[in-house]
């Protein structure tokens, strides 16, 4: 039995029983009730629920023929597209496990994920296949090849039977694996069942007031679990999922995606929201912010005239654990209360319930808890612990987040216990950044930190103790980091220090680190080509400068991934063609100009 007394002492909501349904079953219910309604809008194409279902059924049969099936992983190396949505549904229909990969991540990172997960199949398209690492030894399904298209067209498009799958679907079966940042220097795969999906879907649809007339933005990166929130919020309500045809969504590209797609509902990280004006997206009636702490100023700007909700949840608890009610401009920003199907505990160091107002560690339990970390039994045992407030055999997840409970029951977030941070909606283990930089031969020690620039907001920065007799440059370190880390984990500043400051207990004293040093910019070399002139003008505007040199480094001037999106967009408007990772690999004006294509 649930320990109601302990639960009351912690002022937690007990786990509420919810229906058992798989992702495929949730989807197929809507297909039966709204077959002709628009399910996906992308690049000028509209697909009905019936059309998407038929394509997913054909692909599911192809995947089964190629070796997919219950318990087997299928890697999806696909950009944001209808291909990705249909592939997720197809894997679910086949009873297999989908592993989404972000093809914009470094090849070394993708290679590690594939080697660690060992999927039975890899699905991709021609545009994404070129970005994958070499030497992938697994069957590959190229979805847009003429040969595969012909095979798919010949397959039946009816819903699959249990006989075809080799058994019935079960919500408690492994459904998907998501890789998140890991403190050891390697990302870790979180293995989740579908047991928490029905409660998540019901909570999102109810809180966001999604109806069949709603248009929900598909914003999240394919490798980020918020992707599932968007699919579930749209598809369980019979709404339309708006899928932009671009990998870069912040600032003007995000504003245009919302405006052109007539998006009414979106789930966005606060950093992306902050790149727009509320007045620029009048159709956006419902906005959920999630992925990082929500500033009070953002609530003040965005709450008037629309439904604004703050949500919280780690990957290990099926995307979302708590949500607020509708926020007003003057509200204190909390992370709300647990959604149905989730229990929340705030405990002290002895795992006893914290008193109201007392800060403790946040623990989560419920049907949506992950099975654990792929191939990491020790880490799983460390983070998923027995739940003393519930029936024998139940577990709870140690989030590592600090929280307290207000008198009204809402939960306040107080940061992290460990070295994990949230940056622009992404989870970053500082230890992973430090581990990667420490592998550079000229680095004796590296410390990563989150530093708030008064003008530019939170920045990921690093401090490096050079190996004896070496002087690694910021450019060398950035290039090294970019080989192993995704864009959002590449530091924006590299500061050389003689030694890492320590606390009296011998631990790294992050508070004792100096302010990061931005490299002195060279002066005197002006633009020599039309492309360099265009980029110099953009750099001046982005960094509010009068003079600039073509050897100026974007990141050493304070640039970050959000500003990089702005840079790429402005360059494209001026006729320069640049790709998302271009700025990481070629951060100076002269380097960017040398590889950019200038349209006449």
Curated annotation (Swiss-Prot):
InterPro entries: AA_adenyl_dom, ACP-like_sf, AMP-bd_C, AMP-bd_C_sf, AMP-binding, AMP-binding_CS, AMP-dep_synth/lig_dom, ANL_N_sf
Chain positions with O-(pantetheine 4'-phosphoryl)serine modification: 561
Any one GO cellular component localisation term in the record: cytoplasm
Domain of life: Bacteria
SUPFAM superfamilies, A to Z: Acetyl-CoA synthetase-like, ACP-like
Annotated region (Disordered), positions in chain: 505-526
Gene Ontology terms for molecular function: ligase activity; phosphopantetheine binding
GO BP terms, alphabetized: amino acid activation for nonribosomal peptide biosynthetic process; novobiocin biosynthetic process
EC number: 6.-.-.-
This protein's record includes keyword Ligase: yes
Name of the top EC class for this enzyme: ligase
Name of a matching Pfam family: AMP-binding_C
Protein keywords: Antibiotic biosynthesis, Ligase, Phosphopantetheine, Phosphoprotein
Annotated ranges, domain Carrier: 526-600
NCBIfam families the record matches: AA-adenyl-dom
PANTHER family: FATTY ACID SYNTHASE, NONRIBOSOMAL PEPTIDE SYNTHETASE
Free-text function comment from the UniProt entry: Together with NovI, involved in the formation of a beta-OH-Tyr intermediate in the novobiocin biosynthesis pathway, an aminocoumarin family antibiotic that targets bacterial DNA gyrases. The ATP-dependent AMP-binding region activates L-Tyr as L-tyrosyl-AMP and then transfers the L-tyrosyl group to the acyl carrier domain through thioester formation to form a tyrosyl-S intermediate that is covalently tethered to NovH (L-Tyr-S-NovH).
Family to which the UniProt record says this protein belongs: Belongs to the ATP-dependent AMP-binding enzyme family.
Record-given protein name: Novobiocin biosynthesis protein H
Protein's organism: Streptomyces niveus
């Amino acid at each position: 039995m649930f320990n109601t007394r302990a639960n009351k002492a912690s002022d937690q909501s007990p786990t509420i029983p919810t229906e058992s349904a798989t992702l495929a079953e949730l989807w197929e219910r809507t297909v039966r009730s709204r077959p002709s309604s628009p399910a996906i809008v992308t690049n000028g194409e509209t697909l009905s629920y019936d059309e998407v279902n038929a394509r997913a059924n054909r692909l599911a049969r192809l995947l089964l023929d190629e070796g997919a099936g219950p318990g087997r992983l299928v890697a999806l190396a696909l950009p944001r597209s209808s291909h990705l949505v249909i592939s997720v549904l197809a894997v679910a229909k086949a009873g297999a496990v989908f592993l989404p990969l972000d093809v914009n991540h470094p090849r070394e990172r993708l290679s590690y994920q594939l080697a660690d997960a060992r999927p039975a199949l890899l699905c991709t398209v021609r545009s994404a296949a070129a970005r994958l690492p070499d030497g992938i030894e697994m069957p590959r399904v190229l979805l847009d090849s003429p040969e595969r298209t012909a095979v798919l067209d010949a397959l039946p498009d009816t819903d699959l039977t249990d006989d075809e799958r080799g058994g019935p679907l079960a919500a408690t079966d492994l459904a998907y694996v998501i890789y998140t940042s890991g403190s050891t220097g390697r990302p870790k795969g979180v293995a989740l069942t579908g047991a928490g999906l029905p409660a998540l879907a019901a909570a999102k649809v109810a809180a966001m007031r999604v109806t069949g007339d709603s248009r929900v933005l598909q914003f999240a990166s394919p490798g980020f679990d918020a992707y599932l929130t968007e699919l579930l919020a749209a598809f369980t309500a019979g709404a339309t999922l708006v899928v932009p045809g671009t990998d870069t969504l912040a600032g003007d590209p995000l504003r245009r995606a919302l405006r052109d797609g007539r998006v009414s509902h979106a789930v966005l990280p606060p950093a992306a929201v902050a790149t727009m004006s509320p007045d620029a997206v009048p159709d956006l009636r419902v906005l959920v912010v999630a992925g990082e702490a929500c500033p009070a100023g953002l609530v003040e700007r965005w709450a008037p005239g629309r439904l604004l909700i703050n949500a919280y949840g780690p990957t290990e608890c099926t995307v979302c654990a708590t949500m607020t009610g509708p926020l007003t401009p003057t509200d204190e920003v909390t992370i709300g209360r647990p959604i149905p199907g989730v229990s929340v505990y705030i405990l002290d160091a002895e795992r006893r319930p914290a008193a109201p107002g007392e800060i403790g560690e946040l623990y989560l339990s419920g049907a949506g808890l992950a099975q654990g970390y792929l191939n990491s039994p020790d880490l799983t045992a460390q983070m998923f612990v027995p739940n003393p407030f519930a029936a024998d055999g139940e577990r709870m997840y140690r989030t590592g987040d600090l929280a307290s409970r207000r008198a009204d029951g809402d939960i306040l977030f107080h940061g992290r216990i460990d070295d994990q941070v949230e940056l622009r909606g992404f989870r970053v283990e500082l230890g992973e950044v430090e581990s990667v930089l420490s592998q550079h031969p000229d680095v004796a020690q590296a410390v990563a930190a989150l530093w708030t620039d008064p003008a530019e907001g939170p920045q990921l920065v690093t401090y490096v103790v050079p190996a004896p007799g070496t002087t690694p440059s910021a450019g060398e370190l950035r290039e090294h980091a970019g080989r192993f880390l995704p864009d959002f984990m590449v530091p924006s500043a590299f500061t050389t220090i003689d030694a890492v400051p320590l606390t009296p207990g011998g631990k790294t004293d992050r508070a004792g680190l100096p302010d990061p040093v931005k490299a002195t910019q060279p002066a005197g070399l002006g633009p020599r080509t039309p492309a360099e002139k265009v980029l110099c003008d953009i750099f001046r505007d982005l960094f509010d400068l009068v003079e600039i040199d073509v050897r100026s480094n974007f990141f050493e001037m304070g640039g970050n991934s959000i500003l990089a999106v702005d840079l790429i967009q402005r360059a494209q408007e001026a006729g320069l063609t640049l790709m998302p990772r271009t700025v990481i690999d070629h951060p100076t004006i002269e380097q960017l100009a040398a590889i950019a294509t200038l349209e006449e």
